[in-house]
């Protein structure tokens, strides 16, 4: 992959890390190239791997109460940390966080861009326009999107072209959403096993 990132939204904080040189999803197992912390995160840590203890209400093992999104990137533009998901931005309502699979282009008045990644056009719809209602007039291409709204609530959407699969782990009230069905099965199995479920 050409980058990996994740974001966690809990009742107390929103936390994010981004990496290059993705290795495997088991224990995340990545080499950190840089760290991006959202302003309300609890503290900054630079180290190899992921340490959920830094988040206070998220234990190092077991289930945490919150939403988690992750994205493994296959670059359609420059491979660099700024183009690695999740993308974050702020407007009058608060902070938006999104990950996107697909390829989109922008049609309309120019909006501010910080990267060369097409996903930023989708984020701008939430920040500067009318969210997904703006896609029809301003976005061409295909997209599957997962993110957090300013209230920290998870949202998932896709158009009629982008693949998106979902599994639900009843005992954890946990949804797993992936654009690849095999990834969805593997991640679901990993979460079930890690939490001692069958």
Tell what function each PLM region has.
Residues 1-198:
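Conserved short alpha-helical segments that host acidic/polar catalytic motifs at enzyme active sites
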